[in-house]
């Protein structure tokens, strides 16, 4: 059983997925950009309860590593690492855009909110990333796709048919892992630019 989580977008996502057939046994999603820290652990516990499982039934964890805001990413990645350490199971990190794009078909553009009037984006062909991830103003994003997925507010800026999903899903996170048998790489946040939130400096 796989615990999947993502906090790279306003959606606080946690789900339990059976790896063999990528069946989602339970998924909890709270859309609140200010509640990542408050909602992630309750969503994890609720998803486990919905699935009739406990943490001891988990074989691995997958977490979206961005791109996304500094504070949101930190919550998801720290939580995933803590579960992995406590349970002694591997933790796989994936690009959060891939967790959306892997569930699209044809030539699809995926966009999420990067703030500062910009979007994070990547382009996919039948679920495989072929360009990006990158951060640009919407007008500077290559729009040579046939559809757009991701943040509804930002997808609306493109003259393309909109498709789902709008946020990373538990099944998408699991599908985005290239090789479940491989040793996972260390978790590295994908910011694509300097974080807005920085540790406060101490005056000397």
Regions found by a protein language model. Give the residues of each.
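Oxyanion-binding and handling regions
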Residues: 1-23, 35-39, 92-204
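A short glycine/serine-rich beta->alpha loop
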Residues: 26-33, 65-69, 162
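Phosphate/pyrophosphate-binding loops at sites that engage ATP/ADP/AMP, CoA/4′-phosphopantetheine
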Residues: 44-60, 141-146
């Amino acid at each position: 059983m796989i615990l999947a989580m993502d906090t790279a977008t306003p959606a606080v996502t946690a789900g339990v997925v059976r790896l063999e057939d990528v069946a989602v046994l339970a998924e909890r999603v709270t859309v609140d950009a200010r509640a990542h820290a408050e909602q992630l652990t309750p969503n994890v516990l609720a998803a486990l309860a919905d699935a009739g499982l406990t943490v001891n039934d988990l074989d691995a964890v997958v977490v979206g590593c961005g791109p996304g805001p500094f504070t949101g990413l930190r919550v998801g990645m720290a939580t995933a690492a803590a579960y992995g350490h406590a349970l002694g199971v591997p933790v796989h990190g994936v690009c959060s855009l891939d967790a959306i794009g892997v569930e699209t078909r044809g030539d699809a553009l995926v966009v999420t909110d990067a703030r500062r009037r910009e979007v994070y984006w990547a382009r996919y062909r039948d679920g495989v990333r072929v360009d990006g991830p990158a951060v640009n103003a919407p007008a500077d994003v290559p729009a040579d796709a046939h559809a757009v997925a991701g943040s509804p507010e930002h997808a609306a800026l493109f003259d393309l048919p909109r498709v789902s999903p709008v946020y990373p899903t538990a099944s998408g996170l699991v599908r985005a892992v290239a090789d479940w048998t491989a040793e996972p790489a260390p978790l590295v946040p994908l910011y694509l630019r300097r974080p807005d939130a920085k540790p406060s400096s101490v005056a000397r």
